[in-house]
Amino acid sequence: MKAREASVSDDELIVLLADGRKISVPLAWFPRLLHASSDQRQKYELLGDGEGIHWPAIDDDLSVAGLLRAGA
């Protein structure tokens, strides 16, 4: 599975997948993202052609496979 884009609100992480699905998980599961500023949350990079997401300002990484397992 590969991410196409991500967004972070005050209470959830939303990832749009390349196949059209959308993953939405509570931000509380990711303390670094939860405590990051809105600006830090919005500045992410897709890793490995969308297999992961990296937030440089807080040095945090999440894998799409891990998000799918966590949301299952």
Show which residues each predicted segment covers.
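Motif-centric detector for short Cys/His coordination patterns
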Residues: 1-72
